[in-house]
């Protein structure tokens, strides 16, 4: 079993946010292969309620096909983690609605950790991902004290531009970095 070395401050901060009595939005970003995903998985082990990793855009042809691939993969994550009796979403707004349904179904009152890895890969051109994600956080997550939304990505400029320094829908609701 692997262990984390030299990340005590990060683990302490993640634990503090986990124990918070309000909704928390955390963004973890940085170069590829430095252990972002490993850090989150080790910090939360069996406490992750929903987890999804975006599909690499490499070898995906056409904007429409990339969006379809991302939505299909997200749908399979929903099914694998307990959602039943639903069709594949056609839009990101619908996909996040299905995630809300799953989270309500799984809610037992304890902290729900949602981990979206490689988040920038989900935002394909003209997919409507960012407004749907903003609606998910602003309209649903931020009203629930037991939600901890963690996003991860190696596309630092995307994370900074669209989440942490956003002047759009996440303005003043930007994540802890």
Positions of PLM-derived features:
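Phosphate-binding site recognition
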Residues: 1-177
């Amino acid at each position: 079993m692997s262990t984390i070395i030299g990340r005590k401050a990060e683990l302490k901060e993640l634990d503090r946010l986990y124990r918070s009595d309000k909704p928390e939005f955390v963004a973890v970003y940085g170069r590829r292969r430095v252990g972002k995903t490993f850090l989150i998985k080790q910090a939360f082990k069996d406490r992750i309620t929903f987890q999804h990793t975006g599909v690499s855009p490499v070898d995906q042809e056409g904007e429409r096909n990339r969006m379809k691939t991302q939505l299909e993969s997200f749908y399979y994550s929903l099914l694998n983690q307990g959602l039943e009796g639903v069709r594949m979403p056609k839009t990101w707004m619908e996909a996040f609605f299905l995630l809300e349904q799953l989270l309500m179904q799984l809610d037992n009152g304890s902290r729900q950790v949602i981990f979206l890895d490689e988040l920038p890969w989900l935002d394909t051109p003209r997919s409507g991902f960012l407004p749907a994600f903003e609606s998910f956080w602003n309209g649903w997550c931020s009203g629930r004290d037991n939600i901890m939304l963690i996003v991860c990505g190696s596309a630092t400029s995307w994370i900074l531009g669209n989440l942490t320094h956003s002047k759009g829908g996440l303005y003043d609701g930007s994540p802890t970095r």
